[in-house]
Amino acid sequence: MAEEQQKAGHSNGENIIPPEEVAKFLPETVEEGGWEKCWEDGITPWDQGRATPLVVHLVDSSSLPLGRALVPGCGGGHDVVAMASPERFVVGLDISESALEKAAETYGSSPKAKYFTFVKEDFFTWRPNELFDLIFDYVVFCAIEPEMRPAWAKSMYELLKPDGELITLMYPITDHDGGPPYKVAVSTYEDVLVPVGFKAVSIEENPYSIATRKGKEKLGRWKKIN
């Protein structure tokens, strides 16, 4: 497990606001100033202050593809650094300058620094010269308006190499109204990913969910097949 994650972490996972509560106040903040405003004002209930426990497990168990990896909506950069290694170069992507400044401040002196980078770009329009072997999405799908999900799937397809892998941590699987975060289901991922050329390799419960998210998450692993 990456030592930097433990030093930077300020949350034990118990104070993360459940989606049914976040949905009551976060939309107003997003509407007023966007995600940048959230980061400027410190209204980031989705930020665990450390790497996602599932990501740490996948890294420690050598269960992630090597090569180039992308973490869209990387925020404070915790998962980016957890994934980074000499065999895996990770790009953390976000539209918030404040989020990326925080990430750089936290991890700029990390021993892993040469194995990751942070980029301020729009996931829906950014197309780098080199594609990715792996993309990990936890927060983008549930944060965007539901009508944008087909465009999300299209971007995933265009950013992955042939036979690349998309890992989705599906959250929140709840019945709450409104958002962000907007409620999701396995079918909402299937409905947009399968038509563009993805195949589900596995859909499983997340045994490493933090306390407030237990029973509300599933791990999906998808392969780009055409």
From Swiss-Prot:
InterPro entries, A to Z: SAM-dependent_MTases_sf, TPMT
GO biological process, one term: methylation
First-tier enzyme category under EC: transferase
UniProt keywords, alphabetically: Methyltransferase, Phosphoprotein, S-adenosyl-L-methionine, Transferase
Tissue: Ubiquitous.
Residue sites binding S-adenosyl-L-methionine per the record: W35, W39, W46, G73, D94, D122, F123, Y138
Modified residues (Phosphoserine): S85
Organismal lineage: Eukaryota, Viridiplantae, Streptophyta, Embryophyta, Tracheophyta
UniProt note: pH dependence: Optimum pH is 8.
Species for this entry: Brassica oleracea
Record field: catalytic activity: thiocyanate + S-adenosyl-L-methionine = methyl thiocyanate + S-adenosyl-L-homocysteine
EC nos: 2.1.1.n4
A molecular-function term among this protein's GO annotations: thiocyanate methyltransferase activity
Stretches assigned to coiled coil: none
Identification of the protein by name: Thiocyanate methyltransferase 1
Taxonomy, superkingdom: Eukaryota
SUPFAM superfamilies named in the record: S-adenosyl-L-methionine-dependent methyltransferases (SSF53335)
Role played: S-adenosyl-L-methionine-dependent methyltransferase. Probably involved in glucosinolate metabolism and defense against phytopathogens. Highly reactive to thiocyanate (NCS(-)) derived from myrosinase-mediated hydrolysis of glucosinolates upon tissue damage. Also accepts halid ions as substrates with a lower affinity.
Family in the record: Belongs to the class I-like SAM-binding methyltransferase superfamily. TPMT family.
